[in-house]
Every structure is written in structure tokens, then in C-alpha cells.
Amino acid sequence: MSDRIDRDVINALIAGHFSDPFSVLGMHPTEAGVEVRALLPDATEVWVIEPKTGRKVGKLECLDSRGFFSGVIPRRKNIFRYQLAVLWHGQENLIDDPYSFGPLIQEMDAWLLSEGTHLRPYETLGAHADTMDGITGTRFSVWAPNAQRVSVVGQFNYWDGRRHPMRLRRESGIWELFIPGAHNGQLYKFEMIDAHGKLRVKADPYAFEAQMRPATASLICGLPEKVVQSEERKQANNFDAPISIYEVHLGSWRRHTDNNFWLSYRELADQLVPYAKWMGFTHIELLPINEHPFDGSWGYQPTGLYAPTRRFGTRDDFRYFINAAHAAGLSVILDWVPGHFPSDDFGLSEFDGTDLYEHSDPREGYHQDWNTLIYNYGRREVANYLVGNALYWIERFGIDALRVDAVASMIYRDYSRKEGEWIPNEYGGRENLEAIEFLRNTNRILGEQVPGAVTMAEESTDFPGVSRPPSMGGLGFWYKWNLGWMHDTLDYFKLDPVFRKYHHDKLTFGMLYNNTENFVLPLSHDEVVHGKKSILDRMPGDAWQKFANLRAYYGWMFAFPGKKLLFMGNEFAQGREWNHDSSLDWHLLEGGDNWHHGVQRLVRDLNLTYRHHKALHEMDFDSYGFEWLVVDDHERSVFVFVRRDSAGNEIIVASNFTPVPRPHYRFGINQPGKWREILNTDSSHYHGSNAGNAGAVQSDEHESHGRPHSLSLTLPPLSTIWLVREGE
């Protein structure tokens, strides 16, 4: 029995309770020579090999039958490269000792990670295939400052936590280890003795791929190459650009009819992408594709922020989908969830036995609505983890924009909480100052690092300046979902037309605050679930009136200031609520031409016309781009307004939201001349009654609404028409 290593140390090492394996294992100089120590469970014989010659230079003595070996190589005073020849079950294997390598993380990286200012933490943390001293393998690192011991376990070591305990970098709380021979495609996790002595097995927070549920292991996977954003894609997100978003849940857009199974990323690239392009959309927005354990969360409770879900294929398959979208001229928006995470044991919850990623007080760290945990944005390493993730999706996958979910739940400490269920901030207020700073910092970094990529906020309150720069007190988002517009318009259109005159302001109110933010007008997935009915089914009246109301609503929406968003199925008027477990009702478009085809054709024409005419999109956020012509005709529920581009070209939009046709409806205009009907939601092409103005109408020198020139139109029942001026 050697007196060089204390028996208690050997016992602790074998039991997996020793926190500093590099102080014992590997090669160490002694007075008698260099000593090599190794923990190799189930080995029966171990030799030290000199790689240059292949010669055995020393045999290690088994000091403990559980696999602890040690031996001195005399006449050697300096550390040298070596390998171990290990006899396992009668077969000899030549291995490189993980404990023969020095520290992995550079001091500057460790400092930046500790400070929370490492722009790309995923380049350092996690699992990265690498070559060290000519040896190929994988370097692993994980932030777990309060753990007593952390090991890498995986397919390369029989999931045995004794075999690969990691080195702790105490200055940063990061554990690291290079494992020779570990390679891409192998499964792994981190096994740790936590701060309280409890054994935990965790997935890698920075894993680039993960197993599909219910399995939870991470996969060694190379860091994707950076994607260069083209100038065309940068311009596509501009405030003056036409932005029409098709919001999609990949798992239920379309499924295989024989087994109701999902389409793969590559199948979606071949089917969804050309469909969205044909429909005239400019952007596809994906509900979260980060790995998540529960299908019913739709991806909004992610456990693998850096890993595309395996439900639809591999990481490379997902990149194929994005590349296909870009090749088709479509930008890709990713729903991003930095607001909360699920409490699954294998994830971030109590990661090292402490509330590392979350707040310890449930009044700050627990989300009552969703049974999830809230990130501690005030902890530098946590904020860095999230900021790096935003940059990762844009730089490494070519994502063009991030839509941030549930911003209100992040920035208000009392969100969905009663009195006594929340903790005020340091000034006694309800704002989550750390979350606000996190969002501002994220948006600032993205603006600096990836100009052209943008962020969009789903923010349900009247927090000022969500899409204004921090210098103006804002959060720094480029766009904000206009949930007020969505609620007001849906409330209006669900009314029987006879009552709409009493709620005229529902449609006019939006212009009173339109210039306070850069708005997106959303008819999203949230509006077709949980008993709210489909958009079509909310419309009043019989089938004819329901479809007419919906068409008129869409005509109003696509002409109103703000970028556009439709959830899948809305474009062909699906009649039932969305179900994430099944395909959209594509059968509604089978057989003969019907009302659903009419709505689909209308949405396509709306998209194409909206994109073609600058007046409909160039000045969404400038008061010059909009003017009411008729705003107060509540008795007849008629609205008329003008959209205008920077050159002064106008489009007139006239809506009649009753089933009563309005012939000879006169209103004043700014520009006399011949006005051509470029869109009529009541056209027979869309299965309407085909009332209208024979394609065009000439203005009169007839004073109306305080203007010397006017138009006299036929306003079809339950319709919106668009007119463009052709000349004097």
C-alpha cells in the first residue's frame, strides 16, 4: 500500500465525492521520479506507454481493487506525454489519459464568462470536438459553482460518473475536462454531487443537439458554421419594408395522412416554404423549435435553448429548412422564450443544488400561470447564457428576427400575482429592473453584432417605449405586437352588425396611439385556442355573412398601418380551433371551389398587392402615411381612409361593415382623377356578391367632407375595397 495517496482520498475519488481529481490523477513529479495515477474501474493491468517509441516505461500498481492504480517511473523528473495500455476483461486497449491535459478555458474567457460579458459563451461552454496535443476528443465544460463534484457521463464511459470527474476552475465556477476519443454523435450528460450532497444528472445547458422526448441526453455536436446575412435579408426587416408574417407551428401545419406523424424539417422545406412563397408572405415565424419535453407547451417551455428539437430531424435538417426559406426569398422569425423554463429534473432547475438559474424566492422565481421557473436576470452568468443564445440563433442558423414571448411577464414583478405574492424592486415599484436591463442589453448587442436582424416583442400592457431605444427610456425592440388593436378589432367584428354603430371607436381608437410604437398587427395562435373559437367562427351571422365579415376584416387589417401576421389556417378560414396534435384542415380546400378557396385567394391577393404598393407599407410609423377621410359615420358603420407613401401616392380604403349595400356613397378626397379598384373583398373571385364599381370611378368636383373633390362609390355589403389613382 502506497503512502503517497491517503486512503480517504482514494475512497472519496472512487465514491465520486472528490472535488479535485487533477490533484490526484494524471502524472505528478516526485522525488523518486514521476508518478502516474489513474482511476480505471474494471481494469486488471495498466502500463504507461511512451508514444514516441511505443515502449512500456512503467507498470502501475493496483492500490484498490475498485480500480485505483499508481506507479512511479524512476529516473524521470519532468512531465512527458504518455498513454496508458489498459487490460480490460482480457483485452488490451491503448488510451490517452484525460488527466494529462492542462486547463482548457483561457483566462480571458473565464473572466468574461464570470463578468457576464462573453458575447458568445456557447463557443466555450458545452461540448466541443477538439484536438489537443495531437489527440482528438471532446472538451466539456459546465457552469456549476456550488456542486461538490461534476463528471461527464456518456456512451464513451458506460455512463459511469467515477470515470471522468472534471476540474473545477474556482475563479469562475466552471468545471472542465477533455476526453480523448469522445466524438460527435455520442450521448452525454453531466453527473454531479450537488451543494447538498444529492446526486443529480443534468443535460448540458449549451448542448447543440439533444435527444427527442422522452429521452433527455445531450449529443456531442459541432458548432454550426456562421451564416452571412445578405443585404436583401437585412432590408426585408426595415420599418419601410412590406412585412407579412405567416406564423407556423411546425408540428401541426401538415402531417402524414397515414399515421398522423409530423413532417420532417426537410419535408417542410419542400412543402411549407413554397406554399408560403406562393401565398405572398414575406416572413415565416416559427413557434419555438428549441428542444422541449412537453408537446402541449407548443415549445414555450424549452429545456434545450441551444438545440433545435429532434421531433422533425437533426440540427442540419433544420438549417436545410432555413436555407430553403432564404432561397425562396422568405425571412425566418424564431419565437424565443427567455422568460421562463420548466422545472424538469434534467434541466436548469436547481442545477447544482442551488437556485442557480432561477430566483430562490418563489415570489420572484416561480411562474404560477405556467408552473415554470423564472430566470434570475440579475445574475451575470444567467443573463449571459440568454444573450448568447439570441446571438447564436441569428449568427449560426441565419435566423432573421426573434419574437420574444410574454415580455409583460418578464418586466413586471406582479404579473398575474395578487397582493403579497410578489416582491417590490429596490425602489418599491413593480417593474423588474433586472429583466428590463437584460432586454435592453440583448437588443443593444444584437443591433451592434448583427445589424439587419431585429427583435419583436409580445408585450400585453401599455409599458411605454417597447420599440423605442433605451436612450428614450424604451426597451430597444424593433417591433411590438399590437395586442390592443387585435382585441379591439376582434371585439368589433364578433358583434352583430346592427350593434356595431355603438362600438365605432373600437376601429378608430388604434390610430390615437399608432405612432407610439412600431406595431405588428397579429392574428396569432393565441386567438384560435382555449375555447376562443377560430377567427371565422367568431364572425356573426350565417355562413355567407361569416365569410364576408372575415374577408372585410382581412381587407381592413392589410390596409391599416402596421406589419401583418396571420397564424396558419387563418389564411383559408379554418373553421375549428387549432389543435397542435393534428394537421390543419386542408381537406377544406379539396373538391370544388368554395368559400375557403375564396379566402385563400383573397389573402394571397392582399399579400401581393400590399407588397406592390409602397403606400400600404412604406410609412406605417409616420403620421403622413395615414389620413382619415370618413371617421364618424357610425350610423352606417362606414370607414374611409387614405394610405400614402413618401412620394405622395395614395391608396383609398373604404369599408362597409354592415350587410346593407351603400350605393352612391360620397366622400371627399385629396387627389382628383380616375380611381381604379385594385381589391374588393366582395368580388365573386373570393365568393362574394360581386357588388362594386365596375373596376374604376371618376372623381367629381363636388364638395364633400370639407374637400372640393369627391368620389361616389358603391360600397358592397360587409366589404373593404382598395382604390389607386390612375391619373387626372
Curated annotation (Swiss-Prot):
Pathway: Glycan biosynthesis; glycogen biosynthesis. InterPro entries: A-amylase/branching_C, Branching_enzy, GlgB, GlgB_N, GlgB_N_E_set_prok, Glyco_hydro_13_cat_dom, Glyco_hydro_13_N, Glyco_hydro_b. It comes from the Bacteria. GO terms for biological process: glycogen biosynthetic process. Residues 686-712 are annotated as: Disordered. One of its GO terms (molecular function) is 1,4-alpha-glucan branching enzyme activity. It catalyses: Transfers a segment of a (1->4)-alpha-D-glucan chain to a primary hydroxy group in a similar glucan chain. The active site is at 405 (nucleophile), 458 (proton donor). Pfam families: Alpha-amylase, Alpha-amylase_C, CBM_48, GlgB_N. Keywords: Carbohydrate metabolism, Glycogen biosynthesis, Glycogen metabolism, Glycosyltransferase, Transferase. Belongs to the glycosyl hydrolase 13 family. GlgB subfamily. Monomer. Catalyzes the formation of the alpha-1,6-glucosidic linkages in glycogen by scission of a 1,4-alpha-linked oligosaccharide from growing alpha-1,4-glucan chains and the subsequent attachment of the oligosaccharide to the alpha-1,6 position. This is 1,4-alpha-glucan branching enzyme GlgB. It comes from Enterobacter sp. (strain 638). The lineage of its organism: Bacteria, Pseudomonadati, Pseudomonadota, Gammaproteobacteria, Enterobacterales.
